[in-house]
């Protein structure tokens, strides 16, 4: 979803001179163009434009394209050659580490590749391409998504596993940390928790995905 702002790709992309990396990241057309619905970093590049980050300022977003184009002057479609090149470059990164002996990948912010992709259809298509590559070239490798939507991550995008994140109030968090002081959690010894809140969320997701992959429970920080 992103690289470091010190990555050699980004150091080339932020230059004013055009190169094969100019569209590797998402830049606006002008430094004065910073739509508020996106996280943008302003005034840090030689080129005229602001760059999008996925979260922190040091995480420039890789450009896999936009599913819905709202600013055609700088947004590229998913099938643009430069966006396709980004996906292929990331496959090469994966091949590098798999050839070194890695067993697979935990994928940060797995649902965030393609922008303006509310239903994650275009994002899932990219991950399906990655899964096809793994099945063909590295059949023993596995991927786990930081997604917390197993139907999309496993059934649609092809992940082997999807993290069940403990978002406050969801079924998983109700097991361990719920209520102002954690006193409404299922495993709190006071016995006030309700296992049904967990079961009602988990079991339907399990039934939908059990033949295709695994819902992965974290035992510590998801990172």
Regions found by a protein language model. Give the residues of each.
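The substrate-binding groove and active-site-proximal loops of carbohydrate-active enzymes
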Residues: 58-87, 110-122, 181-196, 223
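Active-site-proximal helices and loops of the catalytic beta/alpha 8
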Residues: 2-33, 92-93, 103-215
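Catalytic grooves of carbohydrate-active enzymes
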Residues: 95-98, 219-223
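Structured loops at beta-to-helix junctions and adjacent beta-edge loops in soluble globular domains
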Residues: 56, 65-67, 146, 166, ...
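Sequence-level motif detector for i,i+2 pairs with an aromatic at +2
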Residues: 50, 57-59, 160, 212-214, ...
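Active-site-adjacent "subsite" loops/lids of carbohydrate-active enzymes
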Residues: 3-100
